[in-house]
Amino acid sequence: MTTKCTVMAVVLAACICLQVLPQAYGRSTQGYGRMDKLLATLMGSSEGGALESASQHSLEKRQIFDPSCKGLYDRGLFSDLEHVCKDCYNLYRNPQVTSACRVNCYSNRVFRQCMEDLLLMEDFDKYARAIQTVGKK
């Protein structure tokens, strides 16, 4: 009897997953198109040169300090900013997103788009202060 209940529960869970997954996939592809357009725009603009040099110059995987940041070194702030870029990479799985997110010490349109896509805009002021602190020139 317990085996039948377990099998029924697994089948029910699989049916629910099949109904939910296409909707989740559809929402994520809309955001993916926006990020592709933004990256393509940046490749042709003045930020594009910085983006290309950032993508050519790879930082170590675990490196938390960005040498383009000339302000106050605060490991906690760098960690918060880098966390946004890593989450954005996990959302889009595009290495250019990570490097573009770090350009100009996180002060760029890709970082802002990542914040919007990750639903972090209610914390915008916190991140803006962090960028100003670590990125003063």
From Swiss-Prot:
Q: Which residues carry this modification: Valine amide?
A: V134
Signal sequence coordinates: 1-26
InterPro entries in the cross-refs = Crust_neurhormone_CS, Crust_neurhormone_H, Crust_neurohorm, Crust_neurohorm_sf, Hyperglycemic, Hyperglycemic1
GO annotation, cellular component aspect:
extracellular region
One GO term (biological process): neuropeptide signaling pathway
UniProt subcellular location: Secreted
An MF annotation (GO) of this entry: neuropeptide hormone activity
UniProt keywords, alphabetically:
Amidation, Cleavage on pair of basic residues, Disulfide bond, Hormone, Neuropeptide, Pyrrolidone carboxylic acid, Secreted, Signal
* TM stretches of this protein: none
Family matches, as Pfam families: Crust_neuro_H (PF03858), Crust_neurohorm (PF01147)
Q: Which cysteines are joined by disulfide bonds?
A: C69-C105, C85-C101, C88-C114
Pyrrolidone carboxylic acid PTM positions = Q63
Q: What does this protein do?
A: Represses the synthesis of methyl farnesoate, the precursor of insect juvenile hormone III in the mandibular organ. Also has hyperglycemic activity.
Family statement drawn from the similarity comment of this UniProt entry: Belongs to the arthropod CHH/MIH/GIH/VIH hormone family.
This one is known as: Mandibular organ-inhibiting hormone
Q: What is the native source organism of this protein? A: Libinia emarginata (Portly spider crab)
